[in-house]
Amino acid sequence: MKRIHSLAGILLVLGLIQSSCRVLMQEADPSSSLEADSTLKDEPRELSNMKRHSEGTFSNDYSKYLEDRKAQEFVRWLMNNKRSGVAEKRHADGTFTSDVSSYLKDQAIKDFVDRLKAGQVRRE
């Protein structure tokens, strides 16, 4: 399938080169522009439809290629961020740490009050 798309792309590029050469030749020789106009009018409708189809196919394939490329770059970016060793803290990590700190602080206050009641702490 990729070979067909590559072939369509090559044919499209060759067609563009041929048409640009035709334009350059017409600019160089004004009498040939009349002949070129008549050949364009005589061009069969099927050929123009084929050109339009090949251009559409090429642009569609190119768009898919760009989307795939962006997806690959995004995956690489994700992988590089994980490999960099910088662990980003999540919100849950912060709340867990805060909860543990609050618990330990409350426990320390409770222990201090218990020692005060027992008379183990000196008052100065």
Curated annotation (Swiss-Prot):
InterPro entries: Glucagon, Glucagon_GIP_secretin_VIP
Pfam family, any one: Hormone_2
Key words of the record: Cleavage on pair of basic residues, Hormone, Secreted, Signal
GO cellular component: extracellular region
Main localization category: secreted
Leader peptide range in chain numbering: 1-25
Residue span(s) of the pro-peptide: 84-88
GO molecular function: glucagon receptor binding; hormone activity
Stated induction or repression of this protein's expression: Produced in the A cells of the islets of Langerhans in response to a drop in blood sugar concentration.
UniProt keyword Signal, yes or no: yes
Ranges of biased composition (kind: Basic and acidic residues): 38-54
Disulphide-bridged cysteine pairs: none
Region of interest (Disordered), ranges: 28-54
Localization annotation: Secreted
Listed PANTHER family: GLUCAGON (PTHR11418), PRO-GLUCAGON (PTHR11418:SF0)
Protein name: Glucagon-1
Protein's organism: Lophius americanus
Gene (UniProt): gcg1
